[in-house]
Amino acid sequence: MTTTGTARTELSTNKGFAKGTLGIMGIAVSPVKADRVWAMVENKDQGGLYRSEDGGATWSKINDERKLRQRAWYYTRLYADTQDADGLYVLNVRYHKSTDGGKSFETANAPHGDHHDLWIAPEDNQRMIMADDGGAQVSTDGGASWSTYHNQPTA
């Protein structure tokens, strides 16, 4: 659903989107390409990652790997890269990174599992903060390495 002032538009009934009972969804809009929208959909038969190139008017299912929605009943988080229109992160027990718009993903781990939230610096996509069951970890190299959660100073 999108909102423009007081008007709302339901996007999940548009062409190409999953039909039937829809569970928890994760949504991300590319800050680089504003009409690109991703939706991770919990659905018994049609669950997976959907992408729209026209602001949600039409959708295509681009990935149905189960690992991406392993805990859809618990949390489903998507994060669009702040510099790369094809960059997308899916958080779960592990986290998954796509560099091809969501068609494929590489799986990675921060020092602790059960990844819940991710912040990507708007001006530098190499600076990130991952929030998980162990606290928070910082990366300055796009997730190639992460700070430890042991003895990390907090304010």
Give names to the regions the model predicted.
Residues 1-155:
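Beta-propeller blade termini and top-face loops
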